Each structure stands twice: as C-alpha cells, then as structure tokens.
C-alpha cells in the first residue's frame, strides 16, 4: 500500500499558492486494509476514507467508465491493481493530474507541470468529453487562475465547443450549475467564467439571457463599448472590484437582461427594459434555484438601477417610495447593495471606469435623513394601529422635503 498527495494541493504548491485542502490517493489497498488501520469510510459511490488523526480524505485509486448520460453516469472500478497513472488519467486537467509520493517527488505522467509553467488549462485525455460538468469546471478554473495568466488550451476549448453543441450540458442539474457559478462569482475575475462559457457555446445553453445581450447595441454617447454583452461583463468586473458579495455580483450580471427583449426597431434605445428584465431574472433564478436573497436583490436591481442613476432629480415622494420598495427599514444592507450595483453599471463602461458616482452619497444621505424619524416617537405622540405607519410616512416625507430644500438652497447660493 502506497499513498500519494494528488490534485489541487500539488498544483498549488508549484503555483506557490496556499493549500486549502489536501487529498490523497491510496494504491495497492482494499477497503478492509484502511478500515483495519482506523480510517473511517465516508464515500458512498466509491471508497473515500478519513485519516484517523488528520481527518484528511484518502481515496482508493480508481478508474471510471462512461455508463450513462450526464456527469453522474459513470461506473467506478477500484481494486488494489489500479495504478496511480490510471487514477490520474481520469482527472479533468493536466495541472490537476499531478501527484507527489511520500518523499515529495513529483509524479507527472501527463505533462501537468509543463502546462502549469506555460499557463495552459489542458484536458488529460479525450475522456474529458464524457463529463459535461467539466465545461463549467474549466471555465471556473480559467476565472480563478486568470490573474496568473492562465488560458484554456485551444484543443480543450474545441472539446468544450463540441460538448456544448452535442447537448451534453442538458444533463447538468440546476443545483450543480449554480454551485459552479456561485464559486466563479466568488473569485477575483468572474467575468472570465462567462466569457469562456460564451467562447465554447455553453453560455447560450446555460445562460441564454446573458448570451442574448451580445450584439445588442446601446447608445454610443452613454456606452462607448456599444455592445450590451460587453457592458454586462464590464459591469460584473466593476462589481467584483467594488464588492465580494455574490448577490451584488449576480445582480450586476443580470441588471440589463431586459435589453435582450426590446424591439430592435428602436435600438440602440431600450425603453421598458427594466420590467422586461424583472421577468427574465425571475425565470432565470427559478431555473437555477438561486438563494432567495440573491434573487430578490437581482430583481430590484433589474427594475430600479436606472432610477438610482437619476436619484438627485427625484421628488421627495418618489425618493421615499424607492426606499420603501428596497425595504431599507427592515433590510438596511440592501441600500448599499443597490448602490454598489448601480455604481458598477455606471462605471462598467469603456473609459469611464474611474468616474465618480455622486448618486451613491446622495442616496445614503437621503436614507440617513428619513431614518432619523423614529417610530418610538410616533407611538409616544399617541398614534396607534395603522395610523402609526401613516404618520411615520408623513414625517419621513417631510424630513426628505426639508433636506432636499436645504440641498437646493445650498446649491443656489454657490
């Protein structure tokens, strides 16, 4: 029995990155061997064991053979005669198919180190096409390692295109698509994930609402990049610069999906894209089974991001209605999330990445004024039942009117 460190831990060592988890492969052993040594079996589909002291995962060397459709349609063979090279052969990318023995010697039968040095994400074998999940995983790795200069190797991208065209992606469950997407949205440059999916044709299959935006023009005076799809990825990139909140990043990604449904006869203008976007975002989130907080923010951003751009011109009553709709009184974090998404939209334009966004400070100040109206004071003044909310709204509106009048007076005095 021999054990080898495999996968991400070996890859990250040669990239000089911190190791998150260490996974091990055991060659020349049967389940009974590990159980006798105190390992705890946790794997259902194939034997995975927890080390009795370190609790790290040890898996018996195995091979996989396609036996059905989708990413779960595999039969697994594990026995003492399975070699390390056979186990590594079933892995997705060469940089993930390296191992180290107990003396720290690299075992690299498929050229992973060379691809790592050349910053290439390359498939290990033609069996890559048997698992549709690998399309998403490669796109995610491309986004994760893009800051280090990694790109998808041309032959691997060609296989991903083939898989997208042949309908294999239809076998991916919504939960798995969202899981991979959520991981990508948590990374430093999630826009690369969606760009790679578009390059291989998977975006049209898995995220048609986003894919449809490419080629849809916007007015050049407002959008120097013109293409709404490009603007969408720029907005996602800016949102990722401003916040690590997955909900903010997803809402930035979907903020303009309604522009894919507007009448081409009126392009490059997109009147009514907000309400159209709300319907699409709702359908998209239902299909992907996104968490409710992610869905709710995306719906609000799709409908109201343009209104926030004009917040300095809004009447006090409209401003209060916006704050009520965002539900800032019960969910104050929503205000900052909405502001970040709108700022990402404004700055996610070619050449305008560094422009200020004064609407952010204005909306925060407006909220601060309205929030100073305390419900306890309304109750102390004798209001009861439904009258409490009515009076609260009246006082908040008056606070906004007074504040806005003072703002305008100060501007006129300059």
Curated annotation (Swiss-Prot):
It holds the Pfam family PolyA_pol. ATP binds at residues 8, 11, 91, 137, 140. Magnesium is required for nucleotidyltransferase activity. Its EC number is 2.7.7.72, 3.1.3.-, 3.1.4.-. The keyword Amino-acid biosynthesis does not apply. GO terms for biological process: RNA repair; tRNA 3'-terminal CCA addition. Keywords: ATP-binding, Hydrolase, Magnesium, Metal-binding, Multifunctional enzyme, Nickel, Nucleotide-binding, Nucleotidyltransferase, RNA repair, RNA-binding, Transferase, tRNA processing. It catalyses: a tRNA precursor + 2 CTP + ATP = a tRNA with a 3' CCA end + 3 diphosphate; a tRNA with a 3' CCA end + 2 CTP + ATP = a tRNA with a 3' CCACCA end + 3 diphosphate. Residues 228-329 form the HD domain. Its cofactor is Mg(2+); Ni(2+). Mg(2+) binds at residues 21, 23. It comes from the Bacteria. CTP binds at residues 8, 11, 91, 137, 140. InterPro entries: CCA_bact, HD/PDEase_dom, HD_domain, NT_sf, PolA_pol_head_dom, PolyA_RNA-bd, tRNA_CCA-adding_enzyme. One of its GO terms (molecular function) is phosphatase activity. Comprises two domains: an N-terminal domain containing the nucleotidyltransferase activity and a C-terminal HD domain associated with both phosphodiesterase and phosphatase activities. Belongs to the tRNA nucleotidyltransferase/poly(A) polymerase family. Bacterial CCA-adding enzyme type 1 subfamily. A single active site specifically recognizes both ATP and CTP and is responsible for their addition. Catalyzes the addition and repair of the essential 3'-terminal CCA sequence in tRNAs without using a nucleic acid template. Adds these three nucleotides in the order of C, C, and A to the tRNA nucleotide-73, using CTP and ATP as substrates and producing inorganic pyrophosphate. tRNA 3'-terminal CCA addition is required both for tRNA processing and repair. Also involved in tRNA surveillance by mediating tandem CCA addition to generate a CCACCA at the 3' terminus of unstable tRNAs. While stable tRNAs receive only 3'-terminal CCA, unstable tRNAs are marked with CCACCA and rapidly degraded. Monomer. Can also form homodimers and oligomers. This is Multifunctional CCA protein.
């Amino acid at each position: 029995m021999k054990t080898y460190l495999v996968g991400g831990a070996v890859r990250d060592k040669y990239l000089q990155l911190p190791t998150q988890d260490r996974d091990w492969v055991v060659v020349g052993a049967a389940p009974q061997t590990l159980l006798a040594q105190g390992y705890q079996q946790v794997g259902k589909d194939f034997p995975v064991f927890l080390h009795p002291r370190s609790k790290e995962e040890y898996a018996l060397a195995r091979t996989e053979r396609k036996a059905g459709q989708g990413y779960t349609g595999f039969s697994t063979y594990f026995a003492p005669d399975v070699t390390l090279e056979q186990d590594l052969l079933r892995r997705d990318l060469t940089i993930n198919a390296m191992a180290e023995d107990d003396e720290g010697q690299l075992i690299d039968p498929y050229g992973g180190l060379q691809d790592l040095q050349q910053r290439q994400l390359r498939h290990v074998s033609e069996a890559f096409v048997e698992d549709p999940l690998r399309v998403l995983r490669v796109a995610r790795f491309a986004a994760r390692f893009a800051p280090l200069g990694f790109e998808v190797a041309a032959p691997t991208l060609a296989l991903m295109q083939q898989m997208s065209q042949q309908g294999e992606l239809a076998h991916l469950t919504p939960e798995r698509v969202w899981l991979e997407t959520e991981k990508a949205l948590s990374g430093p440059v999630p826009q690369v994930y969606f760009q790679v999916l578009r390059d291989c044709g998977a975006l049209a299959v898995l995220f048609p609402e986003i894919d449809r935006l490419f080629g849809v023009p916007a007015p050049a005076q407002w959008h120097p990049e013109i293409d709404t799809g490009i603007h969408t990825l720029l907005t996602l990139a800016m949102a990722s610069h401003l916040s690590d909140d997955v909900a903010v990043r997803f809402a930035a990604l979907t903020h303009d999906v309604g522009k894919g449904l507007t009448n081409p006869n009126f392009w490059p203008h997109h009147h009514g894209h907000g309400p159209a976007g709300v319907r699409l975002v709702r359908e998209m989130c239902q299909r992907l089974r996104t968490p409710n907080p992610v869905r709710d923010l995306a719906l609000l951003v799709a409908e109201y991001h343009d209104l926030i751009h004009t917040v300095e011109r809004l009447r006090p009553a409209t401003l209060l209605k916006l704050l009520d709709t965002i539900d800032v009184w019960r969910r104050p974090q929503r205000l900052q999330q909405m502001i970040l998404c709108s700022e990402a939209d404004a700055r996610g334009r070619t050449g305008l990445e560094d422009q200020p966004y004064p609407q952010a400070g204005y909306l925060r100040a407006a909220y601060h004024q309205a929030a100073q109206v305390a419900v306890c004071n309304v109750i102390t003044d004798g209001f009861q039942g439904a009258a409490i909310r009515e009076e609260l709204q009246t006082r908040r509106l008056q606070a906004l009117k007074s504040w806005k009048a003072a703002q305008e007076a100060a501007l006129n005095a300059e």
